[in-house]
Amino acid sequence: MGEDQTALLNSILKDINIPTARELIDLHKEFNADNYAPNRDEISKRLIAPPYRNSEENLKLKGRAGEPELRQLYINNLIKKTKFKYSVETQTGETYNHTNNNGNGRSGNIDLTIYSPESKKGDLKNLVNIEFKFCTPSAEELKRDITKLVKEKKIDGILYLSLINSNKSTIPKILEKLRKVFLPLEESKDFSKIADNKLVMIFIVVLETTYIYHNIFDFNRAKDNFDKYCEDFFVPSKFSISKIPKIKK
């Protein structure tokens, strides 16, 4: 089962994640770089990066290629390149406790859920849950997203992060935040159940540098020494790193 799950995530990486990153970069450059000719297909070109108000914090950026645009491009590629079915803002099967709900568990929403092509009413075959994040997320935001991705039983997850820019410390800091989010998961009372055959892909795209970073966290491999696995996993050298090539016409 593990090999099939890894193959599925890698096919999504190739067919959806990377093409989406390429188009998001193209959208960002179209609306923020001078004399840049967009190079997306005709469907993706119809998506516009809405203008920012002329406020001081956004003087350097003219158009937003943010989380809503990321999700739209992702769905476009899912439709164009796969047979998967999908839902948006999918209610979670589990309940979660956050600081603002008085300690009572409540359902959350998953940004996007991918189902097998054979799924139908009354017989949904959930394959992957996806959470999108734009700009550098806080530790609390990461905790909420990772909790939802991990605790939904028998469904793998993808955390898709989009950053405008980065320096040499940006990626290490994000990975360290993620390490601190993952570590307490081992103390969950139902850890053995939620982590059984669970995979979570971490995918990061940086719009200005056009680099992508990705790796798959394998809970089965992590079980024997969870602390050590987390320590070894959440470092840039363990991630596949590549520069996104330009879109070919």
Regions inferred by a protein language model and the residue ranges of each:
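Phosphate/oxyanion-binding active-site loops and adjacent basic polyanion-contact surfaces
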Residues: Q5, G63-L70, G105, S138-E141
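Mg2+/Mn2+-dependent nuclease catalytic core
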Residues: C135-K154
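Nuclease-adjacent, charged terminal/linker segments that flank catalytic cores
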Residues: M1-A33, P68, K249
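Acidic-basic catalytic patches of nuclease active cores, encompassing PD-(D/E)XK
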Residues: N35-N101, K121
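Hydrophobic beta-strand segments of well-ordered beta-sheets in folded domains
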Residues: V128, K154-I164, K198-I202
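Conserved catalytic cores of phosphodiester-cleaving nucleases, focusing on short active-site segments
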Residues: L112-E118, K125-T136
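Domain-level recognition of nuclease-like catalytic cores that cleave nucleotide substrates
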Residues: I164-K249
